[in-house]
Amino acid sequence: MNPITKQFQYGQHTVTLETGVIARQATASVLASIDDTTVLVTVVAKKEAREGQNFFPLTVNYQEKTYAAGKIPGGFFKREGRPSENETLTCRLIDRPIRPLFPDGFMNEVQVVATVVSVNPQINPDIVALIGTSAALSISGVPFAGPIGAARVGVVNDEYVLNPTADELENSKLDLVVAGTDKAVLMVESEAQLLSEDQMLGAVMYGHEAMQDVIKAITEFTAEAGKEKWDWQAPAKDESLQTKIRELAEQGIGEAYRTTDKAERKGKLDQVKEQMVEKLTAEDENVDLEESGKIFHDLESDIVRSRIIAGEKRIDGRDPDMVRAISVATGVLPRTHGSALFTRGETQALVTATLGTDRDAQMIDELTGMNTNRFMLHYNFPPYCVGETGMVGSPKRREIGHGRLAKRGIQAVMPSHDEFPYTIRVVSEITESNGSSSMASVCGSSLALMDAGVPIKSSVAGIAMGLVKEGDKHVVLSDILGDEDHLGDMDFKVAGNTDGITALQMDIKIDGITRDIMESALAQAKSARLHILKVMDEAIGGHREELSTYAPRFTTIKIDQDKIKDVIGKGGAVIRELTESTNTNIEIGDDGTIKVAASDQADADAAIEKIKQLTANVEVGKIYQGKVARIVDFGAFVTVLPGKDGLVHISQIAEERVNDVNEYLKVGDVVPVKVLEIDRQGRVRLSMKEAAEKKEEPAPEAPAEPAAEEENKSEE
């Protein structure tokens, strides 16, 4: 084994890259480390593409091993299970900047596996994994236009911080990850506390400039450890077939893209393609239909892009900066705690908000420890939303990613747990989709939360932007359609309110996107965002003052800490019976604070009353209605308060002499008893005799009513 190591300084951290020792049978492997956080990244690439392969099969797997943090997995099997949400998001984070750097026509299967083998809680493994992936691909010899660098940028005390630690991030107004080559930014993922467009763009450029140290180091590492470059050539293009397809389909494609309705346009394109295939196969039975399909798609792209660059109207007839028609409705579902239907053109989201208690919070067992998630946002993209059939079930990577992006957009305006002590779950059901569904989810989530009465600081809106660039000309597109997303050069999504940005996600497919272009795109996005916010605020200007009648209400009571055990009971028996009998949820804090949650206030009041009884102290001289719990030779034990019994001595049962307790009392009888004494050991002495004496007061001189006379007789 001949290890090759590269070490360099990256801001406040030291990065180490090593190859040649571990996983030597992979096409390439790199052990990347930053301050005790270590990720093993392997790349395996097949030398030949599978026959008939018509897409690039790149797979990225990111896995966190619990041994990396010195922990043993929970559960029966004591093994790592399905990928966590964080692992899925990190897979996407790695995939997005590397995918555009593989050449067109490269169809060989490539698998990247990043395994976290050691973790320092202060250093997030995602940046380490990105750097390791870049290094492994660079030394592998596969056709890859890298290396790339990656950086996390924070804002602490209004200063940019490169790769902040976990402690620094807690005080940061920004958590931004940027990746790119030496010439261009390729990917941005961020969450912000209402920062301006200039601050966000400054962070992107700061990170891109800082990552040049990584790119330089990986280039040097590749020169020393890199394998021989693959002798791969892109398949030669069939120019005669291109010419033929242009003749057969160009006019039909052009006419189809004058159709503003998505379904109608798709139908026309399918018809043009079918006619093209018929004519091609009539002339040559052996024509390559897969290649024909690619050429047809490229022709679509050329036509749409050239029209946009020429200043013509967009696919659906809009100007570049125009937002589609917006429709907003709140309170659309009768029994949910909050709901909204947000429609923008042919994109629609049905969003609900549900309020729960702390018991409903999500407990996440991460490498760095247990975390409690009290705000969940889930995004669902069923096949019917694009008029297709398909599998319906657990969320895919894309759905998890879009849900997290929408959550980032909303997080900055959410109230603290002290201000609003509820667990909140928002679900966005995409019911129609033609571009920008994640940003529709941001808008719908804001509306649903306000409809539920959640005191968010302001409305939040999101917008998806696109870019078409040809040579020195470029056009920025607001509120892009699905087709414009596929055919454009940049896709970026911005969420925020009137004061600033809460989330920014950017994916750039080409070089040459300058700071000026990104600046103008962000300015255009702000204008679109403010327009959407105006429409939303007209529908619901702020959160509702009253919660839904179906939402739980909290009632709080404080008890002595030494009384907590009385409310819980042995094995939780008391609190279990209490919640079941009153139809409530009860949560007890270590400081003795008890929160009772109930949809019906009467249920909450009943639970509070029972808790008061459970935690009340027995008072000397007070008369209680006690229940006989046990009879002994020398008296009876009577329960005066839940869990608190006292002894009525045989001499205190009646005025006359009592020889047999059973002649006067039986188990279950409810009798008045007076507390005579509580001794040093906490034992309670009771008296039925004195309770009866106190109860017998002189009758009034006025004649008693007949009913009252009967009652007096019964008492005697």
From Swiss-Prot:
The alphabetical list of record keywords is: Cytoplasm, Magnesium, Metal-binding, Nucleotidyltransferase, RNA-binding, Transferase
Its subcellular locations are: Cytoplasm
Region Disordered: start and end of each range?
689-716
Q: Where is the composition biased (Basic and acidic residues)?
A: 689-698
- What reaction gets catalysed by this protein? RNA(n+1) + phosphate = RNA(n) + a ribonucleoside 5'-diphosphate
- SMART domains, alphabetized: KH, S1
- This enzyme's EC code(s): 2.7.7.8
Pfam annotation, one family? RNase_PH_C
Q: Where is the KH domain?
A: 552-611
Q: Which PROSITE patterns match?
A: KH_TYPE_1, S1
A GO molecular function for this record? RNA binding
Q: How does it assemble?
A: Component of the RNA degradosome, which is a multiprotein complex involved in RNA processing and mRNA degradation.
Q: Which family does it belong to?
A: Belongs to the polyribonucleotide nucleotidyltransferase family.
Q: Which NCBIfam families match?
A: polynuc_phos, PRK11824.1
PANTHER family for the chain: POLYRIBONUCLEOTIDE NUCLEOTIDYLTRANSFERASE, POLYRIBONUCLEOTIDE NUCLEOTIDYLTRANSFERASE 1, MITOCHONDRIAL
Q: What is this protein called?
A: Polyribonucleotide nucleotidyltransferase
Annotated source species: Idiomarina loihiensis (strain ATCC BAA-735 / DSM 15497 / L2-TR)
- The organism's lineage? Bacteria, Pseudomonadati, Pseudomonadota, Gammaproteobacteria, Alteromonadales
